[in-house]
Amino acid sequence: MSTYAVTYRYQASHDELAELRPAHRAWLQSLLEQGAMLASGPLGDFAGALLIFKATDEIELSALLDNDPFDIAGFISERVIEEWNPVFGPFN
């Protein structure tokens, strides 16, 4: 299993995001409970988010992320997936 850093950029309004946020967070919570997601949260400007995942490969992770309610609703304008090698901290 590899660790991946995922960055989202949103194209939805704050109101649109707020309306769908409970479903988005329920989806994230299920991934946390399964051990697929390690951490997530909004970026400082609230125009996107950073998510940390464990996955076999980028293809598997991309397919998983396609199920995000924010993505299904078309709220994500950009999604960047990068393999990450955490040397220090809780994710190594």
State what each model feature region is.
Residues 1-92:
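Conserved, structured core segments of small domains
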